Amino acid sequence: MPSQPPADFTDFKVADLSLAAFGRKEITLAEHEMPGLMSIREEYAAAQPLAGARITGSLHMTVQTAVLIETLVALGADVRWVSCNIYSTQDHAAAAIAAAGIPVFAWKGETLEEYWWCTEQALTWPGHTGPNMILDDGGDATLLVHKGVEYRKTGILPEAENEELAVVRALLDRSGLDWTAMSSEIRGVTEETTTGVHRLYEMHRDGTLLFPAINVNDAVTKSKFDNKYGCRHSLIDGINRATDVLIGGKTAVVCGYGDVGKGCAESLRGQGARVIITEIDPICALQAAMDGYQVATLDEVVDKADIFVTTTGNKDIIMASDMAKMKHQAIVGNIGHFDNEIDMAGLAQIPGIVKDEVKPQVHTWKFPDGKVLIVLSEGRLLNLGNATGHPSFVMSNSFADQTLAQIELFTKPDEYPTDVYVLPKHLDEKVARLHLDALGVKLTTLRPEQASYIGVEVDGPYKPDHYRY
C-alpha cells in the first residue's frame, strides 16, 4: 500500500502524512488479529454488495478502524471518515488511510470546532447531496443530520445548552449543505455504542427518526465481547500508561455494572484492587453483589477510594462536589462514550482550583487546600485518550457486525422501514463462527433429532432473540 496519497488527492486532513508507513505496518499486524473482518472481505469481495454505497463513518480512527474502512472499500463502498472523539484518533492510522486515497478528517487533540468541522466534511460528498449510509459511534453524524433537517424545516437553531451545542448551532447557521435532501437519500445508519443507541430510540419514540437504524451495540457479539472483554483489556492499559500507579491494594469505585462496568470491575480486581460498585438498577446491583463486589452509594465511599471509573452512559455521575471530597491523588476517569459523566465544567469553576498538564490527556487539579486529583482524558474515554482502545481481536467482532449490518440495510431497504432494529440472530452467530478457528474452538454439531427436539435448525440460529447470554 502507498505511503503517500495520489498526487491529485487532497480530500483529507490528518496530523502528519509521514506517519503513513508506520500506520500501514500496524494495520497489517491488526489484519492477522481480525479474522472476522478478513473473512467477510474474502467472502463478499467478488459480489461487491456495497457498490454504490456512500458511507459516512464517524467512529474512532484507530488501526482497527482502518481495517474496517478498507473492508468496506473492498466490498465496493465509497467512504468518508472522521473520528467520534477528539482524543481517540491514532494519527498513524489516519495517515495510512489518507495515503490509500480514502477521505479522512481526523487527528488526535481536535478542538470542538475542528471536531464538528470534520463531521461536516464527512457528510459533504462532491457530486452528491450527501451519504446514503451512515456508520456511527455515539450518534454525532446522525445527530447533525437530524438537527440540520430540523433547522431547515423550522428556521430555529438548537438551544446552546453547552459548549458543544453552541458549536453545532454555529455550524448549522453557516453550513451550505442541503440537510433535507441529504436525509432523503440515507438508507440507514448502523450504530456502534450504547449512547448512540439511546439517541436512536429516543428519536424513534418521539417520531423524529428520519431513516432506519440497526442497533449494532446490542448484537451479542458486540455487547458481550467489545463492551466487556474490550474494556477489561483497555481500561487497565489506559490507567497504566497515564499514571504508572500500582493498582494492587488500592480501592477502586466503578460507577455502573452493565457490560462495560463488568469488564472494568473484573480487570481492576484482577490487578489486586478492592472494587466497589455503584448502581441504580437492582438487577445489576444484585449481579455485582453475587460476583463478590461491595455495592454502595458514591457518597458512602467517595472519600475512601483511590480510583474512580464511570461506565454508565448517563450524565452527572461524579459531580464537582464529589471530587471535592476525594482523597489526595485520587485518579478519576471515564470509559463511557461522552464527557458528561464527570462534571468537568463544575470542577473548573471551583474558586482557586488550578489545572496543570502532566502530559497529554493527564491533568492534575489542585484545590486551594493543596489536595490534588488526577483526571484522565479530561473526562472523555480514557482507554482511547490515554491508550489505544480495545485489542484487534475484540474489535473484529464489533466491526464484522458493523459490516454485515451495512450490507443488510443497503441491500434490503424494503425490508427495513424507519425503525430501530437489532442485527438478525443468524448474522450474530455468523460473526461468532468467524472467530472460532483462530482460538482453536471445535463446535459440537446437533443431530437432526436433537435439533427437532429443541425446535431449531441444525445450523442455527440456536437461541431466541430474547435469550440473555
From Swiss-Prot:
GO terms for biological process: L-homocysteine biosynthetic process; one-carbon metabolic process; S-adenosylmethionine cycle. Its main location: cytoplasm. It is found in: Cytoplasm. GO terms for molecular function: adenosylhomocysteinase activity. The keyword Hydrolase applies. Its cofactor is NAD(+). It is an enzyme of class 3 (hydrolase). Signal peptide: none annotated. Pathway: Amino-acid biosynthesis; L-homocysteine biosynthesis; L-homocysteine from S-adenosyl-L-homocysteine: step 1/1. Binds 1 NAD(+) per subunit. It catalyses: S-adenosyl-L-homocysteine + H2O = L-homocysteine + adenosine. NAD(+) binds at residues 193-195, 227, 256-261, 279, 314, 335-337, 383. InterPro entries: Adenosylhomocyst_ase-like_sf (IPR042172), Adenosylhomocysteinase-like (IPR000043), Ado_hCys_hydrolase_NAD-bd (IPR015878), NAD(P)-bd_dom_sf (IPR036291), S-Ado-L-homoCys_hydrolase_CS (IPR020082). Pfam families: AdoHcyase (PF05221), AdoHcyase_NAD (PF00670). Its EC number is 3.13.2.1. One of its GO terms (cellular component) is cytosol. This is Adenosylhomocysteinase. The gene is ahcY.
